[in-house]
């Protein structure tokens, strides 16, 4: 199914891979081959060429955006004739980047690459990364509410906690704690947190970070997660391609992490290859695909930038929202 944007109607300017790569200009490569290898996700090959042609131009763009936002913040502080009490001690407001997209599309890899590249720019030396997985409701609550089969859907998150976290980040409070999630145990870890302390940039990666709800009829303001973003990226791909990525990842996990008896998914390691593939397809088509079509994909148009991938996890096209 072709879901590419109609250039005649789109609020985006779309670039071919070659056109986008040319926008790197003289941006230097700041990552070594071994560092790039360590940034790869499970089943997501990341080449030096991909970083040079896709992510270096994007890091250059983001560096310009961050510098402009910092300048705007200083102008606002000057206008108010006082240092904003919500600013960090150095007069900077954390710049927040959202990364959205389907399960298995490569969000985490994109987020890690951006974190590594942006931390090399002189005006943003401290770049932190959190995933919204930590803001999922604990399994005990999901089971009690009958939501285990809806894990990853908007209703499975502790939205007030996530909004409070982002509010504290934007207010410059320190440190701010985000709950820690374990994919091994498939649950939020009790009393375990990651501390975020005055980053120049915070990258927030998750399925539904661009999600909105219907506004109330009384006009009361309801914040969305994306209201706190200064820039957002959506990782796109055709459903049949993402399905293949999901199944391939499931099969790799079956042969590795799932073999540990303590793993939440250990039972899947006992399946035959045919049974495992059938199980992966069932999970994808029964849970992840409906979530993609009903909740994730409709938010694509809210992103500032869309990276459209081909079957080998290579970006073929980039769409940048017009100013």
Curated annotation (Swiss-Prot):
InterPro entries in the cross-refs: P-loop_NTPase, PanK, PRK/URK
Top-rank EC class of the record's enzyme: transferase
Annotated metabolic or biological route of this protein: Cofactor biosynthesis; coenzyme A biosynthesis; CoA from (R)-pantothenate: step 1/5
EC number: 2.7.1.33
SUPFAM superfamilies referenced in this protein's UniProt entry, alphabetically: P-loop containing nucleoside triphosphate hydrolases
UniProt: ATP binding residues: 101-108
GO terms under cellular component: cytoplasm
GO BP term, pick one: coenzyme A biosynthetic process
Subcellular location: Cytoplasm
GO molecular function: ATP binding; pantothenate kinase activity
Main location: cytoplasm
Gene3D superfamilies in UniProt: P-loop containing nucleotide triphosphate hydrolases
Superkingdom of this protein's organism: Bacteria
Family the UniProt entry places it in: Belongs to the prokaryotic pantothenate kinase family.
NCBIfam families the UniProt entry points to: panK_bact (TIGR00554)
Protein name (database record): Pantothenate kinase
Lineage: Bacteria, Pseudomonadati, Pseudomonadota, Alphaproteobacteria, Hyphomicrobiales
